[in-house]
Amino acid sequence: MALAVALGGATLPAHANDAALKELRQQIDELRSQYESRIQALERKLEQAQQQAQPAPAATAAAAPAAATAPSAVAMPPKSLDNRFNPSMSVILSGTYASLKRDPDSWELSGFQLGDDGHGVGPGERGFNLGESEISFRANIDTFAMGAVTLGLEDDHGIEVEEAFVQSTALPNGVTLKAGRFFSALGYQNEQHAHAWDFVDAPFVHQAFLNGQYKQDGAQVKWVLPTTQYVELGAELGNGKSYPGAERNSNGLGATTLFARTGGDVGDSHSWRLGVSWLRAKAEDRLWGGGHDHDHGGDEHAGEEKLFSGNSRLWVLDGVWKWAPNGNASSTSFKLQGEYFWRKESGMASVQEPDLPLEEGSYRSSQSGWYLQGIYQFMPKWRVGLRHDRLSQGTVRTAVEDLQPEEHNPKRTSIMLDWSPSEFQRWRIQVNDDRARLGIKDTQIFLQYQMSLGAHGAHSF
């Protein structure tokens, strides 16, 4: 409008002086300059918007000449990849109260030699206990790998590195690699952290044959076959220092694990998985810390040391069946889970007691066990469970008298009820009818809480 006024004002009377004409021309020039500046600014904004809308390769190509001048520089991935160290962190707080009829210090699996200082072996201490709390960190390293660390917190073991591994995320053909420390894929429950268990304690087979839970320091490879039926094959190679192995001053492999799994769906409401696993571990001076079949009332075996050197082979058959109406487990569901273990060991064993000569000789054993448990969610947030454990002493042949077991097949029946007011907390009561010791019945009552803080990944099938 100012321009129109100025142009209209240009039709001046003939008597207008030169000064007025000059002033009008200056005003017109100023207006023209302002409009040209605004048009140029709008053109620059349009050009910038077009550049930002272009695909990332164009920006990469534009930066190529600069990169060529510095060949020693580390190539950085595109900023569009969110690979910054921003791990998800979670904390699991767990605690228990235990009421035990029998002294837990006398607990044993009669007929079985247990590992020394087992993690999760036995009913634990009476009264209030911290239980097993854990802190976990997990993050993508880049587009090809992720990493995870889980620290366990316990009164007896202090701070323990439960898991610390890196795992591939982008290998082709269904292959996944893992390296570091991790819970072995042996059987079904061994891979799970304690807060994911359906009962307070581990099954007898895990306590007797894996000293509670088996960790592997080494590498793992998994391969999901390209078939319509889900089939997964895997192998693990490690140092074998965890029970049934032992610390070894050797460069060779101490343990090998092989496993195969298959599963699928039956209609919309049922799913299943079957697995078979095999573990071979080499033990050198493996310490046995419990499981003898003698009276604990005195100091008869104070300072006694039992050692085993040889081979341990373990076969595991596991199965899981899950039901949820139309696949919706929010209101009601059922899970049936079971595992069968069979172990064979052969080698040399020795027993050293204070002020007595060393007893040593050959040792061969073949022992087995199983458990079966069912978990029924009868309404939202409420579940009830029943579990039965049983071990078979099998055969033990040894020339070492103190390793000759008394005849006993430990068994236990457990019932539990838990309530989860939200996905971040669970309260549980459990009662065990424990007959692990020869001629002794122990009624065990547990109260447990579990709280989850922060982001926590979904559990496996």
Segments (PLM) and residue ranges:
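N-terminal periplasmic/intermembrane-space "pro-region" immediately following the signal or transit peptide
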Residues: 14-118, 230, 453, 457-461
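Generic short alpha-helical segment signal, independent of protein family or function
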Residues: 47, 54, 171, 184-187, ...
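Outer-membrane beta-barrel pore domains
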Residues: 165, 270-461
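Outer membrane beta-barrel
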Residues: 76-243, 250-268, 366-368, 373-394
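Gram-negative bacterial Sec-dependent N-terminal signal peptides
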Residues: 1-12
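Short N-terminal amphipathic alpha-helix/helix-capping patch enriched in small hydrophobics
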Residues: 17, 38, 124, 129-133, ...
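Active-site rim elements
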Residues: 244-248, 305-306
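Acidic-residue sensor for enzyme active/binding pockets
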Residues: 23, 36, 43, 47, ...
